[in-house]
Amino acid sequence: MSLLNRKIIIIGDRDGIPGPAIEECLKGTEAEILFSSTECFV
Amino acid sequence: MNSVLTAASYILVHAPDMVVHNGTTQTTERVVNPGSEYLKQLPEHIRSYDQAVAYAPNQTYIGNMTPGQLGEMEQPWHDMPVAGATREGRYGEIMPQDEFLLLMQASDMFDLVRLDRAFVAKTKPALEKHPLLGQEILALVKAGEDASDIARAVNEEHAEGLYHMGQLVGYVKRAHDVDANLSAHVLLENLASKASAVLALRHLLHTSGVAPEEIEYVIECSEEACGDMNQRGGGNMAKAAAEVAGLGNATGSDVRGFCAAPSHAFVMAASLVKAGTFKKVAVTAGGSTAKLGMNAKDHVRKGLPVLEDVLGGFAVLITADDGKNPEIDLDIVGRHTVGTGASPQAVITSLVLSPLERAGMKIQDIDKFAAELQNPDITKPAGAGDVPQANFKMIGALAVKTGELDRGGLNGFIEQHGMVGWAPTQGHIPSGAPYMGFARQAILDGEMEKAMIIGKGSLFLGRLTNQFDGISFVLRKNRGAAQQQQEPGISKEEVRGMIAEALRSFAASMEG
């Protein structure tokens, strides 16, 4: 899937996949990360 | 010589009116959407005290059921009340809200908590029957004020109301005109946390049989901050709680680290005792009013009761090795370092695999892992999944990755080495700490030898760092006697022989 010209908002989960890990996965793609954070629901 | 886990206590406070008035999900909703359907429906989903007592995870928290017994019950648990459930448990109690409001007043040294005269008259006899609070604490409850004065303070003087069964029964007064850190809101949170830590400490004295004056140091590890505008997190809630609990010979300090703080505190307490600095150290934390009803929107939307209606608290006593109680093995401490990274695999590697490998052990050498022990009844309907299961699955996956476990054995691993969660979502409360009492007992009973307690903390919530955090340690069967036998010592005979040899050599040199 091409992420060219895609803008990304990342909301990670502390006990799932945290924001920085998702950011890491998007490195090397052409997606633009607008916002990234990890939230805690517990 | 390692330090040992001597006792643990666990308390809950049923706080239904605090859910409505002090939980941040509700206070935020009142600001942004004051006429919302959610706020209208919320009161219909609040549980009674008896319902909260009969709730299986709560009975587990205070020690009337084991995690194993809870795990045998089919989920969800909220509509399966425990027959014969009691307020008192092996490790503590579930205190009703009205009694707790009086305990909050007894924990207030600045005359900030004011209660309605009739409410005090009605509630105090119940608190006087409490077997563990004592006259010194009860004497701090005041006669009360007129209802009209209470209403005026809340409506006109920036006081924070205290409610019971929907009625205004008191308030917390602000302690400064402009300092937000001493606002009524902050003081209510801090006093609720302090009072629940006091209750946990009083139960710890009971479960340990230790006299109050024997405890030398208290570490408090909640997520609250106390101070004024010049030192917002000045702290020492530990000493504040120790004072009310009657620990006259104790000083203390606070450890902060979000949900990981208790595990940091256990490692520090164990180190203080191992170093010989103090002989008896208590680690304690009270509950969080802010987190009450945190996921209640989802619970209400799905027709469930509001399950986050209790404040949690615990206290743990760590003492010098007595040759009997389980050791806190400081040779096996895992830590999430600055360089670890945030991926779940990196986190669990740093907390579980690395410390075990350093000690020459395998993952399956640990009988039970206690990570985030949040009650899935609360988290699953809110979309956060089963948090403990997710943690155990990742630990099992690492065991598969290192080749010590077959892929097909993953579910069996989770069942054998994990457990269901039972703790209320009170942040620091579920993070490993609730298993300490059960682990101690299971090790003493010979049911297992080693448990790993894992604390994890979301530092990024404070917006100072994007870092995650965590620390782990191993609680294990006491090796005292065996270790002493194995360690080569010097006998009296050998000492005598060495002295005789030295004297002979000295005499020979004189002769020469």
Please report, for each region that a protein language model flagged, where it lies by residue.
Chain B
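Short acidic, glycine/serine/threonine-rich loops at helix termini
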Residues: 229-232, 264-267, 292-298, 380-383, ...
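Short, well-ordered amphipathic alpha-helical segments that serve as non-catalytic structural scaffolds
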Residues: 193-209, 238, 344-360, 395, ...
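Condensing-enzyme catalytic core mediating Claisen C-C bond formation in acyl metabolism
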Residues: 1-191, 298-363, 416, 455, ...
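Conserved beta-ketoacyl condensing-enzyme motif
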Residues: 193-252, 256-257, 362-393
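Conserved catalytic cysteine-centered active-site region
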Residues: 167-180, 184-188, 227-268, 272-279, ...
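Acidic, glycine-rich active-site loops and adjacent beta-strand->loop/helix elements
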Residues: 221-226, 257-262, 285-291, 455-460
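Flexible, glycine-rich active-site loops centered on histidine and acidic residues
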Residues: 275-310
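Structural signature of cysteine-dependent C-C bond-forming condensing enzymes
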Residues: 207-216, 246-251, 275-285, 358-364, ...
